[in-house]
Amino acid sequence: MPPKTRSGARRTGRRVVKKNVANGHAYIKSTFNNTIVSITDPKGAVISWASSGHVGFKGSRKSTPFAAQMAAESAARKAMDHGMKKVDVFVKGPGSGRETAIRSLSTAGLEVGTIADVTPQPHNGCRPPKRRRV
């Protein structure tokens, strides 16, 4: 039996399905080390995401407000390619990129509806990290 020959190149990866979603939710998780922006449809399925490290920042530069701005702009551009126009923003975490990320979502062209702070507050749960001595 002769060996089978393949014609054409093999395709790897998943195909990107364009969704046409007009409004959704933007979740901004801003920690002391990084900022992650996820944009979802109203049901919670992720349409686009970006983080400071994903945009190209490394090390301590990931925690800067400028890195958060670039991550939010990248996620907003990808979401607008899917037809996103309006987002409700949910911010979590104590990081420095919170306000900058919200501002850059609106300057990228998304209309920002409501802004909610959903940072979890412990009812005296885990012991916090020790104080830094510099």
Swiss-Prot record:
It comes from the Bacteria. Gene3D superfamilies: Ribosomal protein S11. GO terms for biological process: translation. Keywords: Ribonucleoprotein, Ribosomal protein, RNA-binding, rRNA-binding. GO terms for molecular function: rRNA binding; structural constituent of ribosome. The keyword rRNA-binding applies. It holds the Pfam family Ribosomal_S11. GO terms for cellular component: ribonucleoprotein complex; ribosome. Part of the 30S ribosomal subunit. Interacts with proteins S7 and S18. Binds to IF-3. Belongs to the universal ribosomal protein uS11 family. Located on the platform of the 30S subunit, it bridges several disparate RNA helices of the 16S rRNA. Forms part of the Shine-Dalgarno cleft in the 70S ribosome. This is Small ribosomal subunit protein uS11. It comes from Corynebacterium jeikeium (strain K411). The lineage of its organism: Bacteria, Bacillati, Actinomycetota, Actinomycetes, Mycobacteriales.
